[in-house]
């Protein structure tokens, strides 16, 4: 890249962009605005960085979040001064809570134009509170050699902090004085004459950042676990960048200890079922049977990452209070139950690699009870759902788990979508890759995140309800810049189905207007306005035919109209019955 010496702003911005490129940046999502002009031009001019313009800042931030979820590397977000950066806030929160690396560059007016009603100016310093891993205000652009060196080194540190010790957000506030456009002047003549580009950027791309995994010995820990036959492993919400290795590690620990693995639908373990002979997918339903819940009380729990979505599981653990060992290498407190816990600051992969199979432990009656119960409940669920011809919301996740092409990335929205997956997602060997926004568990940015995941990726799928999609329908504006394919499975039950499962559903007249909040939107017309293909699904066979194979390009919506109240009644009636076999 040629450094742009036309003026001090173009110099500053082009050095910033080239430094980030050398560190590994490939994508920048840019929202329109005047104060960010130097940054916009520098990113747009760089041949090795994809600069994607997106109008809506909230949508843009979740789109960037999706791209970063997929790659595990920082994505840059650029916006102008004023309230523009505030629209990034929900995505900043989600990125922090789910450990996604984002590098946010908010352009700002210089210090002399603040606190004096200069226009489009707010206090942007520490705009995102305590959510960033690191945040600072960069100096006003300067053509002095020492300041250019400062910029480079600050960017190196910012990049590192977005990845270590845990992935997350870094916010850089960047003030610019006019001229904002690349109007030539003589301010940069001196440094241009002496500037050695290659020497300035030498070895930036060779930097090795410290690993977030520490090597520890477990000789004293593993024998403690082996003392207990009544133990379980819980594989919670997780997005691994190497899902097969992650699942193999869990299976290795499970076979070493002869413990069943309670596998969350948002963990890859259900999609690599052959690796783990002791996989339990129906634990939420099993634990609704009070007799089984009592007989299956564990003496020890090994929790990998966060707890699953299941409220039944959480309540059971809270009541029984077994000692829990939590495997987590991000340094967080993952004990929302405030039980007797010990955190192991390592990864499951490292832990599994430390195991040595010196002697074989025989299967316990406790393990057999879990596995036998799983087979019975699984069979009942599968037979029940197979026999249902009407468009039942709960059947959709079950069908997807058997129908999508192998290795399909699937983004599962919050509220009822994630819970139906938890209840009914069938163990399989199709290596599906689950994605989700379970950091803060909101419905913000659902569509935009899914588009970010699918961008330049293989054909992907999103499972969502109508309210989550409507909350982010501006994401459809990304269509013209989107490269790839996304199929949206839209469960349209005209409102928030999850509230039908809560006690508030009994309280009219408040419930329908203030909680269920039906929007009565014609999604066919909405899709037409955005230029999106729309299909109204009439039966299961039509849905299956449209899901495999998936198209290679474009966005389409497959809408299933379901009955919110009848589906809720079906769940309330059947969830407990499944474990009574």
Swiss-Prot record:
A GO molecular function held by the record: magnesium ion binding
Cofactor needs: Mg(2+); Mn(2+); thiamine diphosphate
Gene3D superfamilies in the cross-refs: 3.40.50.970, TPP-binding domain
Entry keyword annotation includes Cell inner membrane: no
The EC number(s) this enzyme carries: 2.2.1.9
Keyword list, A-Z: Magnesium, Manganese, Metal-binding, Thiamine pyrophosphate, Transferase
Reactions performed catalytically: isochorismate + 2-oxoglutarate + H(+) = 5-enolpyruvoyl-6-hydroxy-2-succinyl-cyclohex-3-ene-1-carboxylate + CO2
First-tier enzyme category under EC: transferase
One GO biological process term: phylloquinone biosynthetic process
Cofactor, free-text remark: Binds 1 thiamine pyrophosphate per subunit.
Metabolic or biological pathway, per its Swiss-Prot or TrEMBL entry: Quinol/quinone metabolism; 1,4-dihydroxy-2-naphthoate biosynthesis; 1,4-dihydroxy-2-naphthoate from chorismate: step 2/7; Cofactor biosynthesis; phylloquinone biosynthesis
Quaternary structure note: Homodimer.
HAMAP family: MenD (MF_01659)
Function: Catalyzes the thiamine diphosphate-dependent decarboxylation of 2-oxoglutarate and the subsequent addition of the resulting succinic semialdehyde-thiamine pyrophosphate anion to isochorismate to yield 2-succinyl-5-enolpyruvyl-6-hydroxy-3-cyclohexene-1-carboxylate (SEPHCHC).
Similarity comment: family membership: Belongs to the TPP enzyme family. MenD subfamily.
This protein's name: 2-succinyl-5-enolpyruvyl-6-hydroxy-3-cyclohexene-1-carboxylate synthase
């Amino acid at each position: 890249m040629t450094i742009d010496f036309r003026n001090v702003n173009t110099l500053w911005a082009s050095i910033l962009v080239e430094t980030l490129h050398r560190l590994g940046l490939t994508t920048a999502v840019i929202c329109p605005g005047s104060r960010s002009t130097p940054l916009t031009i520098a990113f747009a001019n760089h041949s090795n960085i994809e600069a994607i313009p997106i109008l809506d800042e909230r949508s843009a931030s979740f789109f960037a979040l999706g791209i970063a979820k997929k790659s595990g590397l920082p994505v840059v977000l650029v916006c102008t001064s004023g309230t523009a950066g505030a629209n990034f806030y929900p995505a900043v929160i989600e990125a922090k809570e789910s450990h996604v690396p984002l590098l946010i560059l908010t352009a700002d007016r210089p210090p002399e134009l603040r606190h004096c009603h200069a226009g489009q100016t707010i206090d942007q310093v520490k705009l995102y509170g305590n959510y960033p891993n690191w945040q600072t205000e960069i100096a006003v652009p300067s053509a002095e050699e020492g300041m250019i060196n400062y910029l480079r080194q600050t960017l190196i540190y910012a990049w590192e902090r977005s990845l270590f010790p845990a992935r997350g957000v870094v916010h850089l506030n960047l003030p610019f004085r006019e001229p904002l456009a690349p109007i030539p002047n003589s301010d940069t003549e001196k440094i241009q004459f002496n500037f050695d580009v290659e020497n300035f950027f030498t070895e930036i791309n060779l930097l090795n950042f410290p690993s977030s995994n520490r090597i520890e010995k477990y000789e004293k820990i593993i024998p403690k676990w082996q003392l207990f036959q009544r133990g379980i492993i819980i594989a919670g919400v997780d997005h691994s960048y190497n899902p097969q290795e992650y699942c193999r590690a869990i299976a290795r620990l499970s076979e070493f200890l002869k413990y069943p693995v309670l596998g969350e639908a948002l963990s890859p373990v259900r999609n690599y079922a052959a690796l783990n002979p002791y996989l339990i997918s129906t634990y939420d339903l099993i634990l609704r049977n009070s007799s089984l819940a009592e007989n299956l009380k564990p003496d020890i729990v090994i929790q990998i990452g966060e707890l699953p979505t299941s409220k039944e599981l959480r309540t059971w653990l809270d009541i029984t209070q077994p000692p829990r060992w939590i495997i987590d290498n991000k340094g967080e407190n993952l004990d929302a139950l405030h039980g007797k816990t010990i955190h192991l600051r390592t990864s499951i992969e490292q832990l599994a690699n430390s195991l040595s199979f010196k002697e074989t432990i025989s299967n316990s009656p406790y393990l057999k009870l879990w596995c036998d119960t799983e087979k019975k409940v699984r069979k009942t669920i599968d037979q029940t759902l197979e026999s249902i011809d009407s468009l039942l919301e709960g059947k959709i996740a079950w069908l997807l788990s058997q129908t999508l092409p192998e290795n399909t990335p699937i983004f599962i929205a919050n509220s009822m979508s994630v819970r139906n997956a938890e209840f009914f997602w069938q163990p399989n060997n199709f290596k599906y890759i689950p994605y989700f926004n379970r950091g803060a568990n909101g419905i913000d940015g659902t569509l935009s995140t899914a588009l970010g995941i699918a961008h330049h990726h293989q054909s992907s799928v999103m499972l969502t309800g109508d309210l989550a999609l409507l909350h982010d329908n501006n994401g459809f504006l990304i269509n013209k810049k989107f490269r790839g394919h996304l199929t949206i499975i839209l469960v349209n039950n005209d409102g928030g189905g999850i509230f039908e499962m809560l006690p508030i559903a009994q309280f009219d007249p408040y419930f329908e207007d203030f909680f269920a909040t039906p929007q009565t939107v014609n999604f066919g017309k909405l899709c037409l306005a955005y230029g999106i293909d729309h299909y109204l699904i009439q039966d299961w066979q039509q849905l299956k035919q449209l899901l495999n194979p998936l198209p290679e390009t474009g966005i389409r919506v497959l809408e299933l109209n379901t009955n919110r109240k009848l589906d809720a009644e079906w769940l309330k009636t059947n969830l407990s019955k499944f474990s009574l076999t």
